[in-house]
From Swiss-Prot:
Pfam families, per database record: Cytochrom_B_C, Cytochrome_B
Coiled-coil annotated residue ranges, if any: none
Sites where the protein binds heme b b562: 83, 182
TM region positions: 33-53, 77-98, 113-133, 178-198, 226-246, 288-308, 320-340, 347-367
Other information: Heme 1 (or BL or b562) is low-potential and absorbs at about 562 nm, and heme 2 (or BH or b566) is high-potential and absorbs at about 566 nm.
UniProt keyword Kinase, yes or no: no
Keyword terms: Electron transport, Heme, Iron, Membrane, Metal-binding, Mitochondrion, Mitochondrion inner membrane, Respiratory chain, Transmembrane, Transmembrane helix, Transport, Ubiquinone
Family: Belongs to the cytochrome b family.
A GO biological process held by the record: mitochondrial electron transport, ubiquinol to cytochrome c
Protein name (database record): Cytochrome b
Amino acid sequence: MTNSRETHLLMKIINHSFIELPTPSNISAWWNFGSLLGACLMIQILTGLFLAMHYISDTMTAFSSVAHICRDVNYGWLIRNMHANGASMFFMCLYLHIGRGIYYGSYLYKETWNIGVVLLFAVMATAFVGYVLPWGQMSFWGATVITNLLSAIPYIGTSLVEWIWGGFSVDKATLTRFFAFHFILPFIILALVIVHLLFLHETGSNNPSGINPDSDKIPFHPYYTIKDILGLFMMAFTLVMLALFSPDMLGDPDNFSPANPLNTPPHIKPEWYFLFAYAILRSIPNKLGGVLALLASILILLIIPLLHTSTQRSLMFRPISQSLFWILTANLFILTWIGGQPVEQPYIIIGQTASILYFMIIILLMPLAGMIENHMLKPKW
């Protein structure tokens, strides 16, 4: 008798995607982050749905409605803390997932990689509009500063900003539309995730060695489902610990004050996961130049496949490129630290140096290292 998962139309898709999927036998724990991101997305959609049932997107009541959720709604405090810290977990997994892709050369699956970059933009947009919703001081001023950057676009800039605001400043219309965007974007992300997986399953997964794994594949279930469940438990444990013991550790104290357009906070800064990009934005004194550098810092991921010069796919056997990769990682930590510091010396010069190094490693040094390693591997006779 044929198993229903092999004949039923829907079950067949699930079977070929998650059960009998041929998977390289040597993929490491770094391949766990895809499933963890899926779990994060589900957590965010569910907690967000329950928050949306009680949240009011009006400038007069938004801040109070969040306080009401935390005080009066059954387990509202937990749902809110899980949602706020779930975003941090999402970005941690996202950056590790991208780092894995760069280290092991997964970017050579160009369609999967490009959809992934689009996903990154969508997640960043969702997080940004979501941060505005509690209508605290940092929410309001963050929205004002970041949306104002669009005014740097020549000719249409000012009109574009006022169109996004729905008026001449960040106000009720802005909050209402940001709530609408924040509600719809996760479902767009969900659709993009399916496309991402569709392209991935066309080629199959990459593996740490970077060589063709077709000769040695095993079914996804039970081997990798068990491995993914372990990762899921570890992530869930970290998230619950964060939400229960230090829920405000990654937030900004300014956001405990209701939004006040007449009082600017001394240091306007985004959440920690945007600080590296914010540091790159601030490192250029010109407004338009800063905006272009900000966009380039993410869009640069799209040209990484074009900059691959090595005959080997992975960095596993390439010590020079490995060193550069870890310098790039350290550089991103420095940029994150600088993004949270005031605009004064020595932070300005450190931020500018780190920004130049960021682009230099990706555009110049990594391709150069690949060429040098190719030359070193040539037989000497």
